[in-house]
Amino acid sequence: RRDAPLHLMRIRPDFDEFAALAADHTVVPVWAEVLADLTTPVAAFARVVGDNEGFLLESVDNGDRWSRWSFIGRRPQGTLVSKDGRLQVIGDLGIDIDPEEGMLTALERLLAHYRSPELDDLPPLHGGLIGYLGYDVVREVEHLPNVPADDLGHPDAVISMIGELAVYDHWRQRVTLLANVVINDDTDLQAAYDTAVAQIHQLADDGARAIDEPLMSLPDPSDPIPEVTST
């Protein structure tokens, strides 16, 4: 169905399923799948992320051929930055971080706390942590002398919790639009779910309007069967 209104996208899970998942998990994805067979990952990245922070990951076969998946991420739930031996938290990572505890210790606690459902309909990457650990992070576990001069001024490490994703399945010519929700003890589930749904619609709108290339919603079993004529 071409040019279907964005509000007709099938959002998954529904709220009742979302609330049930939130009872046992600390991060719950909300997503919708639409058709998108007229795009390239680089063009989609330019539209969806633009000049803001984001990432593009490609799956590759044998090191030299593009494969099935492209992952475009933006607006992380939270980011952990290590600089000069101190940690800074931007956003909501779901746990309290001590600025002095070190990146490796913080990551160990984050991974122990992170629980997201494994659902068959989700793409292989739909959440988790992404970023980099610089060489000097090793100084948290090894006492190395002669700290080199910091001539770049970059953080020693930056790790983000994936927030919004557009996952392109080139084999099926579909894109999964996804927003992750961090679940805390005081999370208003209805408000969090509604926010995630709004993020998905915004993600679709940002990806569709920059060029004349429609996102098409998937057919539904309740759709009327069109009449067929022959000549």
Mark where each language-model region is.
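Short acidic (Asp/Glu) patches
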Residues: M103-D120, E142-G153
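Extended accessory regions or peripheral subdomains of proteins
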Residues: L8-G54, S59-P99, Y135-T231
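Short, Lys/Arg-enriched N-terminal segments with co-localized hydrophobic residues
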Residues: R1-L8
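Catalytic beta-strand/loop module used to bind and position nucleotide/cofactor moieties
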Residues: G128
